[in-house]
């Protein structure tokens, strides 16, 4: 995808590195920022289809009961992991899946503030 207009809040597919940096896997992620600078960098948060038994304060579960599940474009219940982040160029984004509501984006922002201030 050459460029993504107004990416903040969008759910996208992107090659996301494993936490040991051994390889990457195409995964859904949420764009946390608008594109920044001449290289059009965005901050992304990882989404996994695994639902933890004990969600962390940085986890948001998207399932049939979440109001944004349908608009997210996710095919199955998933967990947004706000402590698992990366910065990438928008040119690495393969496809847009959906979008988070303003209410969910506010929830994301509050959880990120708590993560970085505690």
Where are the language model's segments positioned?
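Conserved functional hotspots at enzyme active or ligand-binding sites that engage polyanionic ligands
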Residues: 1-118
């Amino acid at each position: 995808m050459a460029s993504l207009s107004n990416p903040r809040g969008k759910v996208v597919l992107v090659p996301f590195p494993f936490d040991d940096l051994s390889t990457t896997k195409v995964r859904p992620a949420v764009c946390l920022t608008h594109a920044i600078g001449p290289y059009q960098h965005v901050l992304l948060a990882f989404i996994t289809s695994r639902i933890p038994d004990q969600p962390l304060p940085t986890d948001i579960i998207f399932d049939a009961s979440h109001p944004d599940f349908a608009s997210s474009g996710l095919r199955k219940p998933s967990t947004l992991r706000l402590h698992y982040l990366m910065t990438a160029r928008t040119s690495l984004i393969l496809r847009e899946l959906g979008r988070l509501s303003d209410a969910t984006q506010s929830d994301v922002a509050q959880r990120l503030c708590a993560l970085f201030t505690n």
